[in-house]
Amino acid sequence: MSITAERKEALIKEYARVEGDTGSPEVQVAILTERIVNLTEHFKTHAKDNHSRRGLLRLVNKRRSLLDYVKNNDKDRYSSLIARLGLRK
């Protein structure tokens, strides 16, 4: 259900703006998206796990907040980020 250290490191390398960048909004959104995808898969087999569903909602809200921050500060970064993550249709 949680992401492995190797997968997290790969996401950091892929979305980092500079070498060693772990805290930029792009990296945070990528990690949150991976966790959201994992939880979504979890709910396909554990539909009544309401405790984890609350955690999923918190992750989605945190990601939305970070995406709003990126959108307000740099629309080009926002557009490229959602395209890379495949979040919007």
Curated annotation (Swiss-Prot):
This is Small ribosomal subunit protein uS15. It comes from Zymomonas mobilis subsp. mobilis (strain ATCC 31821 / ZM4 / CP4). InterPro entries: Ribosomal_uS15 (IPR000589), Ribosomal_uS15_bac-type (IPR005290), uS15_NS1_RNA-bd_sf (IPR009068). Belongs to the universal ribosomal protein uS15 family. GO terms for cellular component: cytosolic small ribosomal subunit. HAMAP family: Ribosomal_uS15_B (MF_01343_B). Signal peptide: none annotated. PROSITE patterns: RIBOSOMAL_S15 (PS00362). One of the primary rRNA binding proteins, it binds directly to 16S rRNA where it helps nucleate assembly of the platform of the 30S subunit by binding and bridging several RNA helices of the 16S rRNA. Forms an intersubunit bridge (bridge B4) with the 23S rRNA of the 50S subunit in the ribosome.
